[in-house]
Swiss-Prot record:
Gene name of the encoded protein: INTS11
Stated name of the protein: Integrator complex subunit 11
Main location: nucleus
Subunit structure: Component of the Integrator complex, composed of core subunits INTS1, INTS2, INTS3, INTS4, INTS5, INTS6, INTS7, INTS8, INTS9/RC74, INTS10, INTS11/CPSF3L, INTS12, INTS13, INTS14 and INTS15. The core complex associates with protein phosphatase 2A subunits PPP2CA and PPP2R1A, to form the Integrator-PP2A (INTAC) complex. INTS11 is part of the RNA endonuclease subcomplex, composed of INTS4, INTS9, INTS11 and inositol hexakisphosphate (InsP6).
A biological process from GO: RNA polymerase II transcription initiation surveillance
Record: residues binding Zn(2+) 1: H68, H70, H157, D178
Pfam families to which the protein is assigned, alphabetical: Beta-Casp, IntS11_C, Lactamase_B_6, RMMBL
EC class (word): hydrolase
Motif Nuclear localization signal, chain ranges: 469-479
Amino acid sequence: MPEIKVTPLGAGQDVGRSCILVSIAGKNVMLDCGMHMGYNDDRRFPDFSYITQNGRLTDFLDCVIISHFHLDHCGALPYFSEMVGYDGPIYMTHPTKAICPILLEDYRKITVDKKGETNFFTSQMIKDCMKKVVAVHLHQTVQVDEELEIKAYYAGHVLGAAMFQIKVGCESVVYTGDYNMTPDRHLGAAWIDKCRPDLLITESTYATTIRDSKRCRERDFLKKVHETVERGGKVLIPVFALGRAQELCILLETFWERMNLKAPIYFSTGLTEKANHYYKLFITWTNQKIRKTFVQRNMFEFKHIKAFDRAFADNPGPMVVFATPGMLHAGQSLQIFRKWAGNEKNMVIMPGYCVQGTVGHKILSGQRKLEMEGRQILEVKMQVEYMSFSAHADAKGIMQLIRQAEPRNVLLVHGEAKKMEFLKQKIEQEFHVNCYMPANGETTTIFTNPSIPVDISLGLLKRETAIGLLPDAKKPKLMHGTLIMKDNSFRLVSPEQALKELGLAEHQLRFTCRVHIQDPRKEHETVLRVYNHLKGVLKDYSVQHLPDGSITVESILIQATAHSEDQGTKVLLVSWTYQDEELGSYLTSLLKKGLPQSTS
């Protein structure tokens, strides 16, 4: 029986370091190749030795697919391709291909140049890795090889994020990456057609959360920022360079404009310009409103938001700063946090998910004394707020996607075990499909029962509907025809068309049944009696007595011969074609009942 095997090397009952191996119909595909933000040693990368202990990985993988540019989905890519060794194709969308190297280089600078870490990829490795990337368009079917094909669907979440369908023959898997089922201020909602994959691999970051209305959250966010600024405090909003950052910038920009506020808003240097550039370049990936108004006004050119200089952090008075990265695990956001943490007037607003091990996760868990580098203790007096502006699907969104795609099986990744368990039960109850949640390194085997698509010729369809009643949508309809297999595809055509295409002559298959009749008369007299009997009974049929002494009823032939041993018995040979099976059987049973007694 065909099977699909799935092994998470990262994001199995965990968030961070997304990397999932899928084996489908003899093809091996790696989905994402991320880095874990909670570790500073080798554990930050997935364990690629699972694929092979020695030798390059190219021999074991048919392709790699990257869903979007966040580092927990693409951060290990240069390490994987250049240090471990992979030369095969890497697929991602055009915006992901453009933005991915910028974020990788940013992170490399923080890790290597500032922290001095070794066993990390170089700038050249990032460039060499990106040369192996093949960029894909949405809804474009890409043929990886003769049998393996992939297709990208819009995922919302961040600019360029995509869900991917992987198909080999009749078997298919859909991998969601990270997605958002509700549109926001700059991106549309994720969408997929009713593709009915054998397996849907979905993220489950917010497996147990159903978010309140977006408007309430936005109002709450603006109120907290406004109150802090009014009392002279500073607000730090840790974000990743692209995505949620633009969402919140648009929100604050319009609020500052409306309220005529004067407190400065800053954004990490350099990244705003880059973000603007890419949002202009890939405007088709944003939502309808931004696309419509883009010619008159670029939503991403902010009047109130200025580039940040690190010296500004020490300026007196209120300010709002968007700084990267979003989990307070390194970089500018962490530096500013250390400076402002000791003042209760200040506030840090965490707008998204933080993985375990990061400073963001620690303060959200209520820790107020943090051990920083060099065993230095940092006391957190500033207010800590968590406001979910996450671009991930919540429980309702995940259920909605399952309803849209109609998969035969579901597998959960990118979430916490307890929350996954709850969602798993909910999915199984509501959709009556198997749901799996493997841990890292654990292989799940899913047996598939692939359906084989068959094209039906128009002529055959017309003929079937002409002779039958209107089809009932709820009941399967039987189709009679000839199945032709050619170039790995199946077609159902009429027998006449099949004969014509294949250059064959039709052979008639006839069935013959012997019926014994007690009649001492001569054979030609018996035939005449049979003819008169059938003529009287079968008034709606053409019954003929032929010169050679045989009888026809439509295409059915009846002949009479004497019994070899009993002169008083005649043998009737009733012969019919397969098409006249019903009439042939009826005639046979009629004759077996015998002939009516003659009056002569």
